[in-house]
Amino acid sequence: MALLYITTAALALLLLFLRAVFKSWRIQRKLPPGPPGLPLIGNIHQIPAVRAHQKFTEWAKVYGGLYTFRIGPATAAVITDRGLVKELLDKRSALYSSRPVSYVGQNLITGGDHLLLMDNNEMWRLFRKTVHQHFKASMCEKEHVKLLEAEHTQMMRDFLLYPEKHMLHTKRTTNSIIMSLLYGIRTPSWDTPHMRELYEIMEQWSKVMETGATPPVDIFPWLRWIPQRWLGNWVDRSVEVGSGMKALYGSFRRRAIEARREAEQSSQSRARTFIDHVLDLQEKANLTDNQVDFLGGVMMEGGSDTGSTMLLVMIQALVRYPEVQERARAELDAVCGEGRSPTWADFSRLPYINMIVKETMRWRPVTPLSFPHALNQDDWVNGYLLPKGTTVFLNVWGLHHDESIFPNPERFDPSHYEGRHNLASDYAASPDYMQRDHFIYGAGRRLCPGIHLSERSMFIGAAKLLWCFQFEPEMDESGRPVAIDTDPITGYTEGFLVCPQAYKCKVSPRSTARAETIMREFAQAESEVLCQYATP
């Protein structure tokens, strides 16, 4: 009798297994074709732990602008076609704006309160609305541009006085901008403690959240029960990142609360910042401290990293392609002369500077693989099925290095954007997908809410650096130029945020008159704008 029960149970399990295999086979027949995988595990063995965007781009050249692969029983799709980005992520954004479940990101690190990882729900929409109100285009024009110009003026002064610290000046600048707008606290120098802490945390965060960097526990939950030391200590690494984030972000919330209390007790007025609006919202919407911390934290992360990295990439390109500097200088000199540095008001008269900014974003994007979307219901695309729950990757690297759109894509060539002189937000909203300049800000409802601030900051920073400085290769002991490594594999860091490895270059002012202008403008910026913000 016992043997009969065992046999019956075994047959039942076999039937269930065969049914699951048959169902999976039927679904796979309807999917967009992609690289063949193995039974049960799919393509897990083919996905590298670092720089997955390179593999995804390699597959796109074989399987086209939309293909799928399997991560165990789960389906993933990769979009490397700008027409499909517009059709799916933009026009069908209601279907494609969810996020995949991430045990590492949501449970171990952020507690589910990080805007980048949150699903498309009421809290996510409330957070997006709050960010938009403070960083929309009109607010940037009316309130934030004066700070952008003042901080980038200090950046010029820092490059002038400490040219050997060029890897730190852009980081200080962008961190100080976002810290001032979020919390009313500047980052006056490159060795300010909160700046060092943030960039250390972000480096760890970037590595642990890169596709393939941790075990696929969302697909195979049983992996959580395997001793983590056998799998790279992924739990400890994740928890350490989360602890660092919570400690740093929480410290700024507590400081803001204390500043509000002191101002109230002394009846003194103080400028309201983003955190003041969030703290007001906390009372109305019953937000937790963790939600408040990560709403400020996500803006701190995005505001600190993207702009600083892109300016460092631009300097790499200027050293390698000096002819770009020559054309930029001619444009800047015709508009500004030597007596003043460029400002945001010069935007329409400096189209080539805007082209340089766009080409920088395209050439070495800081996010070569956008954070994945998730499909919240079945969808049919060109006769193929994308089932509910599919993880959807926007392959930014592949889109930016598409030879049919950008001839000779490995060359830094601002003429790729000849005739496209509007801001990235305009092209992201355009119905003509061929006009889209780049995809560094994402797409659809997940478009970066800081796009308006970032665009203005990047232009101002690029214009001021090019107006004042000459960027050249460093010379070795024999007097030969030392080439900067811009190879996509060896020249940049690992992680979902990709930054240049430390490099050397020669930075020199273009003239004594320009150096004097920098110091005069910095003194004015310090006395009129920068002094309004607290320092640590």
UniProtKB/Swiss-Prot annotation:
Q: Alphabetically list the UniProt keywords.
A: Heme, Iron, Membrane, Metal-binding, Monooxygenase, Oxidoreductase, Transmembrane, Transmembrane helix
Q: Main subcellular localization, coarse class?
A: membrane
Pathway in which this enzyme or protein is active: Secondary metabolite biosynthesis; terpenoid biosynthesis
Report the record's Gene Ontology biological process terms. Answer: mycotoxin biosynthetic process; terpenoid biosynthetic process
Q: Which domain of life is it from?
A: Eukaryota
Per the record, GO CC terms? Answer: membrane
- Please name the CDD domains in this protein's record: CYP64-like
How the protein sits in the membrane? Answer: Single-pass membrane protein
Needed cofactors, names only, are: heme
Q: Where is the signal peptide?
A: none
Does the record carry Transferase as a key word?
no
Entries under Gene3D superfamilies matching the protein: Cytochrome P450
Q: Which chain regions cross the lipid bilayer?
A: 2-22
Pfam families cross-referenced by the UniProt entry? p450 (PF00067)
Which Gene Ontology molecular function entries are recorded, alphabetically? Answer: heme binding; iron ion binding; monooxygenase activity; oxidoreductase activity, acting on paired donors, with incorporation or reduction of molecular oxygen
Question: Top EC class per UniProt?
Answer: oxidoreductase
Specify which residues bind heme according to the UniProt entry for this protein: 448
EC number(s) for this protein? Answer: 1.-.-.-
**Comment field (misc):** The macrophorins cluster contains a single gene insertion (encoding for the terpene cyclase macJ) compared with the yanuthone cluster that produces the linear compound yanuthone.
- What is the role of this chain? Cytochrome P450 monooxygenase; part of the gene cluster that mediates the biosynthesis of macrophorins, isoprenoid epoxycyclohexenones containing cyclized drimane moieties. The first step of the pathway is the synthesis of 6-methylsalicylic acid (6-MSA) by the polyketide synthase macA. 6-MSA is then converted to m-cresol by the decarboxylase macB. The cytochrome P450 monooxygenase macC then catalyzes the oxidation of m-cresol to toluquinol.
- Which family would the database say this protein is a member of? Belongs to the cytochrome P450 family.
- Its name, as the record gives it, is Cytochrome P450 monooxygenase macC
Question: What organism is listed for this UniProt entry?
Answer: Penicillium terrestre
Designated gene of the protein: macC
